[in-house]
Amino acid sequence: GSLQVRGDISATMEVRVTGDVVVNGTMEAALVEAGGNVTVKGGIIGMAEAMQDNPGASAAATARTAHIVCGGDLKARFIANSIISAGQNVEVEREIRQSSIAAGGSVNVGAPNSQQTAITGGHTRALKSVRAGTIGSPAGVPTLVQAGLDPHADIKRSALTRKRLKMNEEKAKLEQLLLFLHSHPERATGDVVERARNTHTKLGRDLIQLDEEEAQLIRDLQPLHEATIIAARRFCGGAKIQVGNKQQEFLEDQVGGKAALEEGQIVIR
């Protein structure tokens, strides 16, 4: 079902629904998982130190980060120190600050051509396009913005690689067991050989299926050539953009424009 929250979602709360979530207030460092859309009429605000790259604070830091996973669109007034994964678009009114965003569609901050909005710090990834007034900040905060690769397929690919390793280990162990039982038939009590063979056959089938999933992912990871990144006002020094597989770093502030791929290179117009 769907859920309407009259006030705020406070820190450490966990919300899981199959439909949509609408929050009339703000959302702190909580967890929201929704099958549909998530709308936060206030802002989404994790705690400031949570997203800093401090390996020692990783578990505690995750607890202080706002975390949203939704199948549809995510809409909010602003997003700070949050981890967001949306199946479709991420629409923000004012600013995305020090957050990790993955969108299966586009990320838009403010209305088209609005000068006052910004993406500052963090890592923002979308399949189709990313748009804001300013990308980066005058203080030179490292900011990475990517468009043209499916962010979810990228995350999924690492998960599949781990799964394959585990399955291959299991298969090798079973093969050793079957060899051992073949040379010591007296140790093969009950239906142990049959069970091991069945499991081995099933693993073989699962690995073939994994190959198919990986092949599909590689197709999904083909860069989208019409992807764009737009900064209506400016790209700041310290920002890095990636369109498809091409990257460009800004060493100093540059007037805004639309970055796209032309003949395999990033061109800003």
Regions found by a protein language model. Give the residues of each.
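Polar interaction faces of repeat-based domains
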Residues: 21
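Intrinsically disordered, low-complexity terminal regions
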Residues: 40, 45-269
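Short helix/loop capping segments that flank catalytic or ligand/cofactor-binding pockets
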Residues: 13-14, 25, 133-134
